[in-house]
């Protein structure tokens, strides 16, 4: 495992950086594909100074020194956070350090997607093989003037993430703080309760879909188990929906959006 992190202040200025790499545990088999993507080799995996446990100890110590903070990376919620949680759990450490004890987590990829939902030309992009705009970090960094030859090493990817986000911050200064509000579940829930209309941006197979929604009354339309608020897609005729029977409404709810 290799990890790289940069501590920033509220103005996005660097305060400190941290990087560490450990030897591969003897019970693990390396992936040849991962070695190629990360420009690594067997020597780097087997001859590092730190054991797996020692490195995780350093990571936990550094995370606690930097807390409370907003932890974010590029596609980190779906990948990096899950790796950290699993490795911390297996080494008998608290796995949810990035979103407890005053910390919150966010994902730079989601901020980039939100920025494009507001302004489709906020950053230069290229098309992927499916004809959609590529949201890959290396692609965005390269096309917007940042050196990306070292992409896929941990600390270098962190540097690229900071540069891409800082460019969005410069181009959309008024919206910058709004993007970070979505790091808090409580703030998002309150926004939905207070606003009469809000927009949801979802990604399916690399394509952005925007939905204009209106929240339903919380006293009657909360999820029975998870207590999530529910809303209606305003593309559809609300009056027609209101006239549906309970069984017909259930059928409509199960259809693909």
Where are these regions (language model features)?
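Acidic, Mg2+-coordinating catalytic module of metal-dependent nucleases/exonucleases
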Residues: 70-77, 83, 120-186
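Acidic two-metal-ion nuclease catalytic site recognized across multiple nuclease folds
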Residues: 166-257
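A general structural signal for short secondary-structure junctions and capping/turn motifs
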Residues: 62-63, 152, 219-224
């Amino acid at each position: 495992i290799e990890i790289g992190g940069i501590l920033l202040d509220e103005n996005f200025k660097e305060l400190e950086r941290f990087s560490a790499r450990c030897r591969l545990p003897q019970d693990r088999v390396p992936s040849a594909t991962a070695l190629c993507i990360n420009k690594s080799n067997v020597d780097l995996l087997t001859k590092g100074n730190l054991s797996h446990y020692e490195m995780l100890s350093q990571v936990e110590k550094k995370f606690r020194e930097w807390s409370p903070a907003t932890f974010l990376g590029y596609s980190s919620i779906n990948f990096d956070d899950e790796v950290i949680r699993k490795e911390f759990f297996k080494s008998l450490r608290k796995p949810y350090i990035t979103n407890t004890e005053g910390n919150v987590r966010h994902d730079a990829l989601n901020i980039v997607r939100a920025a494009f939902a507001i302004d489709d030309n906020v950053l230069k992009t290229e098309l992927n093989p499916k004809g959609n705009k590529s949201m890959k970090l290396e692609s965005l960094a390269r096309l917007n003037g940042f050196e990306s030859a070292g992409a896929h090493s941990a600390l270098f990817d962190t540097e690229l993430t900071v540069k891409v986000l800082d460019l969005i911050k410069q181009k959309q200064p008024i919206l910058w703080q709004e993007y970070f509000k979505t790091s808090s579940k409580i703030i998002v829930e309150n926004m939905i309760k207070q606003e009469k209309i809000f927009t949801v941006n979802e990604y399916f197979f690399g394509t952005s879909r925007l939905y204009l929604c209106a929240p339903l009354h919380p006293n009657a339309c909360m999820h029975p188990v998870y207590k999530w608020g529910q809303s209606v897609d305003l593309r559809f005729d609300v009056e027609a929906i209101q006239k549906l029977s309970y069984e017909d409404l259930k059928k409509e709810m199960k259809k693909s959006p």
